[in-house]
C-alpha cells in the first residue's frame, strides 16, 4: 500500500547512498533523529538533508515532513524501512533523520541531491 506522504519513488541506489551518508554523518554526531528533532532542525535552517522511512505507521508521524522540507528548500529522500534507517543511527527504528553536517562526505551528499533533482523533474 502506497503511503500518502511518499511524493516520489526513490531509486534503490539513491536510498542506499542516503543510508550510507546517514551512517557516516552519525559517527560525527551531526544528525538529528526522531520527527520532533527533525522538524526543529528544518525550521532552524540547520538541516542539509532529511531522510524519511516509507513504512511509518501511523503515517501522520511524518506526513507533513515533505511539505515542510519543500517550504524550507531542504532536500529529502525516502528509504524503504525505518529499521534500516534506525540501524544507521544506533536505534531500533527511526521514522526520520536530519543530516545537519555531512562532514567529509560532500561528494556523496552532492550526488544524492543531484539525483533527487533529476527524479523530481
Swiss-Prot record:
The keyword Manganese does not apply. Transmembrane segments: none annotated. GO terms for molecular function: ribonuclease P activity; rRNA binding; structural constituent of ribosome. PANTHER family: RIBOSOMAL PROTEIN L7AE FAMILY MEMBER. GO terms for biological process: ribosome biogenesis; translation; tRNA 5'-leader removal. It comes from the Archaea. It is found in: Cytoplasm. Part of the 50S ribosomal subunit. Probably part of the RNase P complex. The gene is rpl7ae. GO terms for cellular component: cytoplasm; ribonucleoprotein complex; ribosome. Pfam families: Ribosomal_L7Ae (PF01248). This is Large ribosomal subunit protein eL8. Belongs to the eukaryotic ribosomal protein eL8 family.
Amino acid at each position: 500500500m502506497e503511503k500518502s506522504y511518499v511524493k516520489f519513488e526513490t531509486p534503490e541506489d539513491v536510498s542506499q547512498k542516503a543510508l550510507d551518508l546517514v551512517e557516516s554523518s552519525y559517527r560525527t554526531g551531526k544528525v538529528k533523529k526522531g520527527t520532533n528533532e527533525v522538524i526543529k532542525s528544518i525550521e532552524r535552517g540547520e538541516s542539509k538533508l532529511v531522510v524519511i522511512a516509507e513504512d511509518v505507521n501511523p503515517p501522520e508521524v511524518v506526513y507533513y515532513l515533505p511539505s515542510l522540507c519543500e517550504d524550507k528548500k531542504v532536500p529529502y529522500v525516502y528509504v524503504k524501512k525505518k529499521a534500516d534507517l534506525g540501524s544507521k543511527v544506533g536505534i531500533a527504528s527511526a521514522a526520520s533523520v536530519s543530516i545537519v553536517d555531512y562532514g567529509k562526505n560532500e561528494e556523496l551528499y552532492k550526488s544524492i541531491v543531484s539525483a533527487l533533482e533529476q527524479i523530481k523533474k
